[in-house]
């Protein structure tokens, strides 16, 4: 089946209720020169896209949401309508490139065509060029999109990566079929029992998420969104992050979120706002994608909703608290609640879930301030048409009153942070990016001079 799931379709609803929202996710690859000509690039791209049918499909919507949107082959598909070329004034610098990315990501994709675009950007200094790839979020989550984008590289031509990409939903031979409602009684009973057990396990997580969403955050960084964006990015060596991880027995995600926390803290202070416990309640997507589903084009995520400790002044204490809160959020059932909710929603008639999602999207959300998503990327350097990919920056959208978003992506030997912000609210997205780099450097310096003492059975620096 090629229908969208409830989660996939929710990204369309988020656009429907707010004309200023564009829910495309992106990846910006900066590549060594020279840039290929348009004909050669189109020919190479066509060859690499051929194994993945999704790039040639558009959505067929049902009137009044009477059925789930469905992927269908576009009879008028023209690659030239999806690949655009633009040039910066030579020699284009990083600020000019990021300004262009902000403008391009603010533009909505045309729902009458396959929901993706590729922009070839020329004019960068040192003969470099760039590729911005945009995919609508209803088409793929961050991990699926990263695998799709890696499939466009030269490395994918020598293996079966692209050919393993499947459609959004596999054929369902038993159980429930959307529209037909054919049910096997014994399987339905088993499924119902499993769902109920999941609901019980996720009850605590549900209460935590509900409390987070319904409690207004003490922050000016959530509210209505304009139609203009700012973009900036940070880059830190993975070796530095891993050194902090080893020293303090934390994860890469802990270090990244602690750095983001410090940067937001500085922004609050400069805006004259006192950082409080609930000033940075953050939506942290959690992948539920199994290894066997890495190449499937859909969304498979749950969520956590921790308060990042912007009220804490000490960098090391911030790292400890981030680690502790993420550990508690995972153990407390927040991620399980998201899984259970999606499992239930996908078993209900689509008109019912579409109505409910649309209603929720229209409610003024003031509890969550930002989103921070971390996607593992290629650990080997990539090449495109024989040219090295020097940098790979992620771009995640903003929506639902979240005026900033931070996407993290590991590539080769570095960890990249992409910051997208509402133009009217954040005057300098570069300040957030620089703050992240400074925060990581500070943690690295602390790790080099700090001795970690062990209590019986645990590190003294970890709560």
Swiss-Prot record:
One of its GO terms (biological process) is response to nitric oxide. It catalyses: an acyl-CoA + a 1,2-diacyl-sn-glycerol = a triacyl-sn-glycerol + CoA. Induction: A member of the dormancy regulon. Induced in response to reduced oxygen tension (hypoxia) and low levels of nitric oxide (NO). Its EC number is 2.3.1.20. The keyword Acyltransferase applies. GO terms for cellular component: plasma membrane. The active site is at 137 (proton acceptor). Pathway: Glycerolipid metabolism; triacylglycerol biosynthesis. Catalyzes the terminal and only committed step in triacylglycerol synthesis by using diacylglycerol and fatty acyl CoA as substrates. Required for storage lipid synthesis. NCBIfam families: acyl_WS_DGAT. This is Probable diacyglycerol O-acyltransferase tgs1. It comes from Mycobacterium tuberculosis (strain CDC 1551 / Oshkosh). The gene is tgs1.
């Amino acid at each position: 089946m090629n229908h969208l799931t409830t989660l996939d379709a929710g990204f369309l609803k988020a656009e429907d209720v707010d004309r200023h929202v564009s829910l495309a996710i992106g990846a910006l690859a900066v590549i060594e020169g020279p840039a290929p000509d348009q004909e050669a690039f189109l020919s190479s791209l066509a060859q690499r896209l051929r194994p993945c049918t999704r790039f040639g499909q558009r959505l067929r919507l049902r009137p009044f949401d009477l059925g789930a949107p469905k992927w269908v082959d576009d009879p008028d598909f023209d690659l030239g309508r999806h690949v655009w070329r633009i040039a910066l004034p030579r020699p284009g610098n990083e600020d000019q490139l990021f300004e262009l990315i902000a403008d391009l990501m603010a533009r909505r994709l045309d729902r009458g065509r396959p929901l993706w675009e590729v922009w070839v950007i020329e004019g960068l200094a040192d003969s470099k060029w760039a590729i911005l790839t945009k995919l609508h979020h209803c088409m793929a989550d961050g991990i699926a999109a990263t695998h799709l984008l890696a499939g466009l590289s030269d490395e994918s031509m020598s293996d079966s990566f692209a050919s393993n990409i499947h459609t959004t939903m596999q054929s369902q031979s038993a159980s429930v079929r959307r529209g037909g409602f054919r049910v096997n009684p014994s399987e339905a009973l088993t499924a119902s029992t499993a769902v109920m057990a999941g609901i019980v396990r996720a009850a605590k997580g549900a209460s935590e998420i509900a409390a987070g969403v319904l409690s207004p955050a003490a922050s000016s960084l959530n509210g209505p969104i304009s139609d203009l964006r700012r973009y900036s990015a940070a880059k830190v060596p993975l070796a530095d992050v891993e050194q902090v991880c080893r020293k303090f027995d934390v994860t890469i995600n802990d270090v990244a979120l602690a750095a983001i926390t410090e940067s937001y803290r500085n922004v609050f202070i400069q805006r004259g706002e006192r950082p409080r416990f609930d000033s940075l309640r953050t939506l942290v997507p959690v992948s539920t994608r199994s290894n066997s589903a890495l190449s499937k084009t859909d969304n498979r995520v749950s969520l956590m909703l921790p308060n990042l400790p912007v009220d804490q002044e000490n960098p090391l204490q911030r790292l400890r608290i981030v680690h502790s809160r993420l550990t508690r959020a995972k153990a407390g059932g927040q991620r399980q609640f998201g899984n259970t909710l999606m499992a239930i929603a996908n078993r209900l008639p689509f008109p019912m879930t579409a109505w409910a999602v649309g209603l929720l999207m229209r409610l003024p959300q003031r509890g969550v301030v930002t989103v921070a998503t971390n996607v593992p990327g290629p650990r080997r350097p990539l090449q495109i048409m024989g040219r090295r990919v020097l940098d790979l920056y992620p771009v995640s959208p903003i929506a639902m009153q979240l005026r900033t978003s931070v996407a993290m992506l590991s590539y080769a030997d570095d960890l990249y942070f992409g910051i997208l912000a509402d133009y009217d609210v954040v005057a300098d997205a570069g300040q957030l990016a620089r703050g992240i780099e400074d925060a990581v450097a500070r943690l690295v310096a602390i790790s080099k001079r700090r001795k970690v003492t062990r209590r019986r059975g645990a590190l003294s620096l970890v709560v």
